[in-house]
């Protein structure tokens, strides 16, 4: 049974995209009225090793917008995380497919982080791993661009999980 108000952001290794998405989403939810501002956000990776440090470029990209993720360590996506979430927000279709192939029964509350943007050129957020800082900043900006439509979706979701 889902715990009302828990959201999981998912990428591959949980060291670049999903920690940035987690921090950005926490920041956005904190500015919302209850119940959204009390919702919990965690991140995980479909191929993560537990305890890996967050990418330095992810730390720098978020520091530039006033968010600190330097203490983040990776965790693998688990059945418990999925079962306790009202929404699992993936960075790519391949992450969604991997979850659908890995977990039985297949969770139905899996979405792309940018899925709710009606005019987005791409619904996916590419992996900046190993790239220069500007690629991490572009990744961050794609997430920031998705936040307003994601907030609208989460408001609708909140009204259903009361």
What is each stretch, according to the model?
Residues 18, 92-93:
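Helix N-cap/beta->alpha junction signal
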Residues 4, 87, 93-162:
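Phosphate-binding/catalytic loops
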């Amino acid at each position: 049974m889902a715990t009302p108000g828990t959201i999981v952001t998912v990428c591959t290794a949980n060291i670049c995209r999903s920690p940035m998405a987690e921090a950005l989403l926490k920041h956005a939810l904190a500015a919302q009225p209850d119940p959204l501002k009390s919702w919990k956000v965690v991140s995980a990776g479909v191929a993560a090793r537990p305890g890996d440090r967050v990418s330095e470029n992810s730390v720098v990209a978020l520091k530039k917008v006033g968010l600190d993720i330097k203490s983040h360590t990776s965790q693998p996506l688990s059945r418990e995380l999925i079962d306790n979430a009202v929404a699992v927000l993936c960075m790519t279709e391949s992450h969604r497919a991997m979850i659908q192939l890995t977990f039985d029964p297949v969770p139905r509350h899996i979405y792309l982080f940018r899925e709710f943007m009606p005019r987005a050129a791409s619904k996916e957020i590419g992996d900046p791993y190993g790239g220069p800082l500007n690629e991490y900043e572009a990744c961050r900006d794609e997430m920031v661009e998705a936040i307003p439509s994601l907030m609208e979706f989460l408001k609708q979701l909140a009204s259903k999980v009361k």
